């Protein structure tokens, strides 16, 4: 249940205020559907077991007037769990209200020490201590509500019910009813039920919020790198319908702890379905913000030197033996240098045909001369527009170049006699080698970054990346994220 409730909120992050209302302003939207909750609910038992085991069971003391014995004082001390198992659980979404989880046949054996005392008719004080076991069978009903608290998800289970089908007291391992057992069972059972309900429900609520913080902290880490982070705080309370959970996030990129507080676009719930397990909706504004921080952080540049430059040319099938190549590089291709960098922040837009990137770049070629004392530099300034479609398969990101346009702006260091041929040659190099190489490196960089954050540990099934005018949609199915649950349970110990 807790896994089904909180692991779904893996985008939730930093602390900011939540707005109220029915409009959904967001840069990023996460929707998790009923089929996903059923998958996550598979491991409910492990989290519930942690709640039972972590709960603090206080000593139970009391006094009871009993026939023949008079006033009997008693106490159950050092109550602990010696055995616990869970038969099954079910999860349901209640429209605009809660996530309801029913847990059936929780078999729990408690153990501890029973101390009791009384005064006989002859004035003799009797004090006894005996070990006990309590064999119980319990059903739980937990209705969890999700709210936004200062930009973070909070969970609350105001409705938490325990139904006891069995509550048997065994003293010192004896299974046959004894007179002490008969005397104590009835009036201890009622008190014990109240204590167990209070402590277990309290611990379930505590663990659910610990898990919420755990997942949100992990999400913030996944979506950060160096000085770049993402403000994924909630813009309002999560939405619960009969078929999905949905959360809305700001999606501002943060650079060196500074982010722009721009107006957020309005999200329409009709843009997402409920046939896949998990949906992410990214507004075009998110990619604009990404381009800005990447440019500010100096990440939009590439430098190739010597043998690496020659190897790249050969990788893309560029003929390095042609005469003009030898002429341009001065006979020393292993000493050539090429640098590429953006002159200003790229513009990124989402369209039906793909993600369109408009960038102004400078490409500089530096080739040594035969005396190796001098070099010749050729510099190109160009506007490049590329249309890209992304896909994810076998734990790798793939970028497909659908279309590109290059508009030359300025060219320097070309003599009149060589300008046309050299410019054509270098332009061909940019087209046939430069753009594919940049795409290939972006694939590798993004894949390595995602894997370093643990994305490769997730069992992502049939992911689809779909672009539409103004937004990008990511939809997928998945297997249970066992590694996240293991990490969380270890953090509790």
Swiss-Prot record:
CDD domains documented for this protein: BPI1
Name of one Pfam family that matches: LBP_BPI_CETP
Induction cue: Up-regulated by high-fat, high-cholesterol diet.
SMART domains reported in the protein's UniProt record: BPI1, BPI2
Expressing tissues: Probably primarily expressed in liver and adipose tissues. Detected in adrenal gland, mesenteric fat, spleen and aorta.
The reaction(s) this protein catalyses: cholesteryl (9Z-octadecenoate)(in) = cholesteryl (9Z-octadecenoate)(out); 1,2,3-tri-(9Z-octadecenoyl)-glycerol(in) = 1,2,3-tri-(9Z-octadecenoyl)-glycerol(out); cholesteryl (9Z,12Z)-octadecadienoate(in) = cholesteryl (9Z,12Z)-octadecadienoate(out)
GO biological process: cholesterol homeostasis; cholesterol metabolic process; cholesterol transport; high-density lipoprotein particle remodeling; low-density lipoprotein particle remodeling; phosphatidylcholine metabolic process; phospholipid homeostasis; reverse cholesterol transport
Function: Involved in the transfer of neutral lipids, including cholesteryl ester and triglyceride, among lipoprotein particles. Allows the net movement of cholesteryl ester from high density lipoproteins/HDL to triglyceride-rich very low density lipoproteins/VLDL, and the equimolar transport of triglyceride from VLDL to HDL. Regulates the reverse cholesterol transport, by which excess cholesterol is removed from peripheral tissues and returned to the liver for elimination.
Similarity section: Belongs to the BPI/LBP/Plunc superfamily. BPI/LBP family.
Name the record gives this protein: Cholesteryl ester transfer protein
Species the sequence originates in: Macaca fascicularis
Organismal lineage: Eukaryota, Metazoa, Chordata, Craniata, Vertebrata
């Amino acid at each position: 249940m807790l896994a089904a409730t909180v692991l779904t909120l893996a985008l939730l992050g930093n602390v900011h205020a939540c707005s109220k209302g029915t409009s959904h302003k967001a840069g990023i939207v996460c929707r998790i559907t009923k089929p996903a909750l059923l998958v996550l609910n598979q491991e409910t038992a492990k989290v519930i077991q942690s709640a039972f085991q972590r709960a603090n069971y206080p000593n139970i003391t009391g006094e009871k007037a009993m026939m023949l014995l008079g006033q009997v004082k008693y106490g159950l001390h050092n109550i602990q769990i010696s055995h616990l198992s869970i038969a099954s659980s079910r999860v349901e979404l209640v429209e605009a209200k809660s996530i309801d989880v029913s847990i059936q046949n929780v078999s729990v054996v408690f153990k501890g020490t029973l101390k009791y005392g009384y005064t006989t008719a002859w004035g003799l004080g009797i004090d006894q201590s005996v070990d006990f076991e309590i064999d119980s069978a319990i059903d739980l009903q937990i209705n969890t509500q999700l709210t936004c608290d200062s930009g973070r998800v909070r969970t609350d289970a105001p409705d938490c019910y325990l139904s006891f089908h069995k509550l048997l007291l065994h003293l010192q391992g004896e299974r046959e009813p004894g007179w002490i057992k008969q005397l104590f069972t009835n009036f201890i059972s009622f008190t014990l039920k109240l204590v167990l309900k209070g402590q277990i429900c309290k611990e379930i609520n505590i663990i659910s919020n610990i898990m919420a913080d755990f997942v949100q902290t992990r999400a913030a880490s996944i979506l950060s790198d160096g000085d770049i982070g993402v403000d994924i705080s909630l813009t309002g309370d999560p939405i619960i319908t009969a078929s999905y959970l949905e959360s809305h996030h700001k999606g501002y990129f943060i650079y060196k702890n500074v982010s722009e507080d721009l107006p957020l676009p309005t999200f329409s719930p009709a843009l997402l379905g409920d046939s896949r397990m998990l949906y992410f909706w990214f507004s075009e504004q998110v990619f604009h913000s990404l381009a800005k921080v990447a440019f500010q952080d100096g990440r939009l540049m590439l430098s190739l030197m010597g043998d690496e430059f020659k190897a790249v040319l050969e990788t893309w099938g560029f003929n390095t033996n042609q005469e003009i190549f030898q002429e341009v590089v001065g006979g020393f291709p292993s000493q050539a240098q090429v640098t590429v960098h953006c002159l200003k922040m790229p513009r990124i837009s989402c369209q039906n045909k793909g993600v369109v990137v408009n960038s102004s770049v400078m490409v500089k070629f530096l080739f040594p001369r035969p005396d190796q004392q001098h070099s010749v530099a050729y510099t190109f300034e160009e506007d490049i527009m590329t249309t890209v479609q992304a896909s994810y398969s076998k734990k790798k990101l793939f970028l497909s170049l659908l279309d590109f346009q290059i508009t030359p702006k300025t060219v320097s260091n070309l003599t009149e006699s060589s300008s046309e041929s050299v410019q054509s040659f270098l332009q061909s190099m940019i087209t046939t080698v430069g753009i594919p190489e940049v795409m290939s490196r972006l694939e590798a960089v993004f894949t390595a970054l995602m894997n370093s954050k643990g994305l490769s540990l997730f069992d992502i099934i049939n992911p689809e990346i779909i672009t539409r005018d103004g937004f990008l949609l990511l939809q997928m199915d998945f297997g249970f994220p066992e590694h996240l649950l293991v990490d969380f349970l270890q953090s509790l110990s």
